[in-house]
Amino acid sequence: MLFDTHLHTKFSADSKMSIEDAILSAKQQNIGLVLTEHLDYDFPGDDIYEFNPQQYFQEYSSYQSKTLYLGVEVGMQEHTLIQSKKFVESAPFDQVICSLHLLDGKDLFYESCYTENKHTVYLNYLNTMIKLIKQHDFANILGHVDYICRYAPYAKKDICYEEFHDT
């Protein structure tokens, strides 16, 4: 069975999906789910990417099965590493994705991250990701490596191995 292993519900600031709707959609597609609510301490802006893991498990544990698992997506930042690790250790998560959503403390969604040329910005992104995933040794999965490509203002947004394999 295939699984969608990166899915947010109402416990994430960027989703309003109910677990019931997620399960119904998964059944229609004949796939399993791993819910991965956002945990991104000290995220800039108005949205709070934090949730109560005890409440999460209290509400959702009865749905756990061979086709539904409960996880978390941790936003990686060096200064929140210890806090994030304690959070992950506070509950029996089935899966832990660690992702890079910020670069030098700035949200990759905004053009203010892209003041340098593409190679410089992407190299900083990749080097930061490598450094942080090594520190976040509690991760099972490194999330969306190409996240920067969604929002970068460059004509050619893709990360190409040929451009970075020597650096």
What are these regions (language model features)?
Residues 11, 61-69, 73-120:
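Active-site gating/metal-coordination segments in enzymes
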Residues 19-28, 79-93, 125-139, 164-167:
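Short amphipathic alpha-helices and their capping/turn segments at secondary-structure boundaries
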Residues 1-78, 149-162, 166:
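An N-terminally biased module of ancient metal coordination in phosphate/nucleic-acid-related enzymes
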Residues 11-13, 97-167:
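Domain-core and long-helix interface of multi-subunit machines
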